[in-house]
């Protein structure tokens, strides 16, 4: 992403948000901890954050969101004109399938075994099953589903909590980075086809960010000061294949209006420094050595708008705002902006 583009992003970021009323009739979210807003709260899992200091800047306090405030789908929902946050599937009423649900689950991945060492999580396969059950029980019309906005952000854990974690996983010994990315894309293709069969036509597919630049990976796979090139290079292979998959869907699948969101370029720590952030490789909250989540009820940084990362893996609300607006306005999404998907 060029500096010129990010200068535009900075202007958009600081400008007042203008919303012209709800555009899409409903919004459905699938993914992992980047999008989870409470689905893991009652699971037997280490991947849940329904405690302080998470939600430090969120109106309702700790809700299960892996940030100090709003997540990317929260902000995209606001930009799309939704008056209320899309509820987590675990807490939603049946009729809310007409306006949207969030099925995302911290720790989830494309592969079923991903993050199994963390305990229970809702895989992307199960998330789609939950979606099918929800829209079927609520009898949501097919015509309405085709007008809804969909967002899916999955795959990070297949690298963080699988491929680059030697125990209890052996995928790195079995696959080269190219082979592994291809195996994930095969799974992804199947799930996107299933989502399309369930009525989805307007889907924002998020690529992976620069995982090698997260504080967790910088500590475990580098010297703690620079990004892990090995991890980022593996992610780039996956992203290229995912980008191609989205473009292929648009060409071959009837009615598909999928867009690819380039989180890798959009999540460049140097770009965030250029935007005015001051801390890119350190968490805002207190994280114990060898862990990734905030220590409960411990001090956090006062200048949260200057930090890219909230904990050792997840971004601050300020970062989420930049990414959400960049994808919504088409700065890091192609061939459509999410704004186009929401209103067409």
Curated annotation (Swiss-Prot):
GO terms for biological process: lipid catabolic process. It is found in: Secreted. It comes from the Eukaryota. Residues 1-21 form the signal peptide. One of its GO terms (cellular component) is extracellular region. This is GDSL esterase/lipase At2g19010. Its EC number is 3.1.1.-. Glycans are attached at residue 303.
